[in-house]
Amino acid sequence: MTQIKVDAIISKQFLAADLNEIRQMQEESKKQVIKMEIVWKNVALFVALHIGALVGLYQLVFQAKWATVGWVFLLHTLGSMGVTGGAHRLWAHRAYKATLSWRVFLMLINSIAFQNDIIDWARDHRCHHKWTDTDADPHSTNRGMFFAHMGWLLVKKHDQLKIQGGKLDLSDLYEDPVLMFQRKNYLPLVGIFCFALPTFIPVVLWGESAFIAFYTAALFRYCFTLHATWCINSVSHWVGWQPYDHQASSVDNLWTSIAAVGEGGHNYHHTFPQDYRTSEHAEFLNWTRVLIDFGASIGMVYDRKTTPEEVIQRQCKKFGCETEREKMLHKLG
């Protein structure tokens, strides 16, 4: 594994927060009144999705076969890992490198999650890290918890986000043929992996009702995975530990680690953005790390970046709290 050099992180514009620009944007935003334009098409789609998901939840609890319950759990785990291990840790942060076969695998399971194609997802996430909690942050917590959770998808993007996002260098993403294939074929891929196969397999393999399979394994599971991911943008900037940086809004949170297969170490992640582990939590709370380590064990993942212990300790002593870190690791480590 490769240990991260701090100056190497700072030199890459999509990894480190630009504190000077953040302060400037925050001061400018105080002088402005934000008028959010609602995108009613998105509102209607999400309302319909949540109604369908509630039907699916009822069926999952009272009507679905046990095999379908397990199938829903498996799909959530795979789809989430396509986001966390793929769009997030591999492509947005370049926290490790992978062979073509592994990248194709991650791209396909990412399509289960249906959270925009990986290029768009990584672009938004790089904006989030570079200009955290400003108008150039897609889901800034300064605009409220609901906005950070899902409201940002229900309104038009702020002009500042469009301007700043256009400045990012995304050439590494556009040069990856796997990502370009997904981008060009996104709707068919989502149709197959997010909706068709999740419905078809329970019907064929264990005789589940097509109606129940669709509402549980497709709609409910899709909606649940969305909220698990969104909780990182909202809950993980709201309540939890801040052992690494008390100045940041990000926190480490146990429950978001469980729901989002290992993404809950958010204070750690914002402090050390290129560490492939994204937290110091134990493996049972970081299934994405387990997946990446498995990929390394079979030769498909390499150059996993980690943060040296002395750098973590120095950071905690200067900007965080060593005692809080010890307490957190005692509970979660």
Curated annotation (Swiss-Prot):
- What EC number(s) does the entry state? 1.14.19.-
Where would you find the membrane-spanning parts of this chain? 42-62, 66-86, 187-207, 210-230
InterPro entries referenced in this protein's UniProt entry, alphabetically: Acyl-CoA_DS (IPR015876)
Q: What class of enzyme is it?
A: oxidoreductase
Tissue specificity: Expressed in the intestine in adult worms and in all four larval stages. Additional expression in the pharynx and tail cells after hatching and throughout the lifespan.
Q: What's a GO biological-process term for it?
A: long-chain fatty acid biosynthetic process
Note on domains (UniProt): The histidine box domains may contain the active site and/or be involved in metal ion binding.
Q: Which family does it belong to?
A: Belongs to the fatty acid desaturase type 1 family.
Please report the name of this protein according to its UniProt entry.
Delta(9)-fatty-acid desaturase fat-5
Origin species, per record, is Caenorhabditis elegans
